Amino acid sequence: MESSDVELDLQRSVQAVLRELSTQAPALQSNQGMWRWSLHKKVERDPGKSPVLVRILLRELEKAESQDLRHVIIPLLHTVMYVLTKATGITEELYQRIYAFCTRLLTLPTPYCTVALDCAIRLKTEMAVPGTLYQRMVIAEQNLTNELYPYQERVFLFVDPELVSASVCSALLLEIEAAQAQQTPETCMRHVVSHALQAALGEACHAGALHRKLQASPRRTLEHYFHAVVAALEQMASEASPSREGHVERLEEIYCSLLGPAAGRCGGDLVQERPPSIPLPSPYITFHLWTGEEQLWKELVLFLRPRSQLRLSADLEVLDLQGLRPDRELARVSVLSTDSGIERDLPTGADELPAPGSPEMERAGLQRKGGIKKRAWPLDFLMPGSWDGPPGLHRRTGRPSGDGEMLPGVSRLHTARVLVLGDDRMLGRLAQAYHRLRKRETQKFCLTPRLSLQLYYIPVLAPEKPAASRQPELGELATFLGRVDPWYQSNVNTLCPAIHKLAEMPPSLDTSRTVDPFILDVITYYIRMGTQPIYFQIYTVKIFFSDLSQDPTEDIFLIELKVKIQDSKFPKDGFSPRRRGVAEGPGAELSLCYQKALLSHRPREVTVSLRATGLILKAIPASDTEVSGSSHCPLPAAPVTDHTCLNVNVTEVVKSSNLAGKSFSTVTNTFRTNNIQIQSRDQRLLTLSLDKDDQRTFRDVVRFEVAPCPEPCSGAQKSKAPWLNLHGQQEVEAIKAKPKPLLMPINTFSGIVQ
């Protein structure tokens, strides 16, 4: 195909991607996500098209900047970065232009500046050492062992068989297994070596001969060259002022060692054959059927256990984190003393006092010999912001997003990407597991310092049924994510029909043939490029029952709490006797006490009594005007993308009198609040349903209280730290901050686009 034809074909594909972002035509909506996938497949099958596509995408980015078409900037940035991660042969001039474009975007508001900064950091790394992004991604995702880059990632795919059909579960499992059967460690190491040499040597690299040589090499030889290439790139990336010439010479030595001395820059055939494609292997994915809220914690601990330095016992008790000093105000894990307590067992000279002013004397007030040392972890280490990585502009070059050293000597080398498939009910169960995990961290602080946790969501809804039997809307959160992030809508929300179509297809028993798994490719794209979290407030509800012998219970919800009025009544000597003078009618007499959300952020308590047939408390904004920074919501001490207002919809009964007698009608009233208490004032009982889940239903309720769920690790009480100053005269008193709300992050491509 001529170069002009190639450019025209790629230009048409890019325009198709842009059109689906700019129109809501049903004809285009049916193919949403497919255009982006086919565009990447074109350059994957023919890597020589990559520079042409990068130029086209850069031209469209500059056009969007000049015409202020901001809605296409982030999708185009993600597209070009995905191409650059795989590509070789991109000129320095193209890298510089894209880098300059990203730096210009830093003046724009979030999320544009956030995404642009992340892209600029990765571009700078790739410009300094070509091939670094590809190499690090493959090593981390495939868990290839290397001392110079020890980071590991794993994708945990959770599906609840109660919410997703068995055919869908089987189809997804077969597609994942078929793809991973072709991705052995040897294959991935060949890809890393081949990509690094082609990226550094360019046209001087005989790609076909290199590919054949690597295919014929035994595992031991392959591992030798793999570690040599990784060492060359990582040492080059760690230098303050890397020498491009020295880097190329070092990789040329490896190349000549593979193919022989004649394969230098001037060696080889003058006419090169078409270079073979170097695919980017899909990440290592483990498939799990959801069994309960404890499963997430256990799987994450098992992920850490094999190669970590944590000493995890059978009951998941934690460990002594080495390298922590008490004078850094760090928490105290229980450390079992090895001191026998007998004076003669002390080493010689142990009872001699150190010289005044020596380091040992300065630390004397901070240590004691023997006994059980107990530390309380500082508040900042236990917050979601420090756990999942600060949600903003802070990224570290060469490390997965959110990773780094939280504690001295403790690095977060593991990244767990938890992907859940299902509807709103599955998200409610995930919120329960997330809350349970955070509570465990207050007692067993083993995941936080070692693990970066990223949450992802792909909606899988049941096929549409007739209107008479259709369930309530179960894709509310997915609809919200698609509304605030158009690229999520285009790539993720459109996967549901494709997943059901895959489940209807007969399984293929031939695993030897190479296929293009569309669903797995889109999942992989979302996992890699979805780096911007949207934070959702988790709410806690305290429930009181009509049976006074039954203790109140507490639960949490993420999306919705629905209240229905039961037909049954509780006895007159129950929790709350029926008031006299209350007219009979539909519904129940309710007392509502809530804190009204005001523009001034001043607390204002409102108490009202009314007759209602039901209530719904919604935690997800219903429209774009309620997203991020609404004037009716008090601003929380958290990222600007938080949502901490409940939308309360009350179906109120209105009594009217006319010539025919008394009649009743209903009207829906809506207000917004953060905290609310609701109590039945007559003999009617209530039924509560959390997150639309039939398994999370509470009956015979007379009163309940709803408030933002606090971060389990935070508190308002005082704690005294028995650490003295150098003179041993003062006691430090640490006052914990006001409890922070517990926010659950779900990763998207851009966060909230205003």
From Swiss-Prot:
Molecular function, one GO term: 1-phosphatidylinositol-3-kinase regulator activity
GO process terms (BP): angiogenesis; G protein-coupled receptor signaling pathway; immune response; positive regulation of angiogenesis; positive regulation of MAP kinase activity; positive regulation of T cell differentiation; regulation of natural killer cell mediated cytotoxicity
Superkingdom, natural source: Eukaryota
Entry's localization field: Cytoplasm; Cell membrane
PANTHER family from the UniProt entry: PHOSPHATIDYLINOSITOL 3-KINASE REGULATORY SUBUNIT, PHOSPHOINOSITIDE 3-KINASE REGULATORY SUBUNIT 6
Function: Regulatory subunit of the PI3K gamma complex. Acts as an adapter to drive activation of PIK3CG by beta-gamma G protein dimers. The PIK3CG:PIK3R6 heterodimer is much less sensitive to beta-gamma G protein dimers than PIK3CG:PIK3R5 and its membrane recruitment and beta-gamma G protein dimer-dependent activation requires HRAS bound to PIK3CG. Recruits of the PI3K gamma complex to a PDE3B:RAPGEF3 signaling complex involved in angiogenesis; signaling seems to involve RRAS.
Protein name listed in UniProt: Phosphoinositide 3-kinase regulatory subunit 6
Gene that specifies this protein: PIK3R6
